[in-house]
Amino acid sequence: MDKRNKANVVLSLCSMFASRGNCIPIPIVFNIYMRAFPKLVGRGTSTYARRRRARSILRCERCYRVYPPLPFSKKCDNRTCVPGISYNIKVADFIKWGVTEVIPHPGFNF
């Protein structure tokens, strides 16, 4: 769908809510808008692709720490871990989105 059709959907939703009352619930309009259009398939964002890329550089796909963890680190269990305050952005981008320009070497630029 092009941008004009998406804009028409938003305007029609807002006008429908405005005709039924004084307020327009923006979160509900946004939720309907996000569910109205199909998600783009592919682009390497699947969970399987994230796990495969994380395993290729020996990192956890959730918190981007070294996995399997070192003997003295206890923060990553690969089940309930979350990223820390300052994690490596290059590693996170590679795990989330993959590589488009260069092929990284494990342990070289990470």
Swiss-Prot record:
Residues 50-53 are annotated as: Basic. It comes from Helenium virus S. Keywords: DNA-binding, Host-virus interaction, Inhibition of host innate immune response by virus, Metal-binding, Suppressor of RNA silencing, Viral immunoevasion, Zinc, Zinc-finger. Belongs to the carlaviruses nucleic acid-binding protein family. One of its GO terms (molecular function) is DNA binding. The keyword Metal-binding applies. One of its GO terms (biological process) is symbiont-mediated suppression of host innate immune response. A zinc finger (C4-type) spans 60-81. Suppressor of viral-induced RNA silencing. The potential mechanism of action is based on sequestering siRNAs. The keyword Zinc-finger applies. This is RNA silencing suppressor. InterPro entries: Carla-bd.
